[in-house]
Amino acid sequence: MRPEEALYCDYRGDFELSDNERKKFISNNYTVYKDLKERGLIVKIDDSGLRVYDRKTETKGQASAIVLPKDFEEQIDFTNIFGELEKGLDRRVQIGIIDSDKDVVYYVIKGMKWTETKLKEGQKSTITDDEVKELIEKGYQINSGLKFGTHYRVYNYESNHAPWLIHVIKEGINWLDIARMVRVGHGVNKTIVLAYKQKWLSIEWIKP
């Protein structure tokens, strides 16, 4: 039995752990595990994270998602996120951000590739930064994203309003900063895209 499972059984009263065992076993993994279980989901634990099966999903097959717990004050580290995305498995990669009240907010993260587009007649980019050179070369219109609290807003040929907001990830940013960005993006119906070491990640709020 995994520590997370033992703590959850203790919480439900199935058996009792000692105070020392509780202190030893408590972790961010447990906080997210307990939250998912309380939502009625089937959760399995492995060394990568928490494998979650959507309701009515057969548990003998592929998990619906892998959930990676993150503390809201942690500085951002994408190592295990990229590791999961690069596996190419047919499951969502999610993070569960834990706040100071031990509540959890969930986000789905996807690797993103930009397809070719073109500028609308009479439109132009006002940004020429190296961070978005790829997008400019592919025909996207790039303008400042300051009014949305991000670095850039991005238009393709089909859009009258910017579908994407790009934020460049630099040292010192934590997961609370990301949660703020996604909240703003959700409120104005835009997808937040994180630019990190010449890679692109879209991030959206999700209800488990």
Predicted regions: what is each one?
Residues 146:
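Phosphate-end processing signature that detects enzymes handling 5′-triphosphorylated RNA
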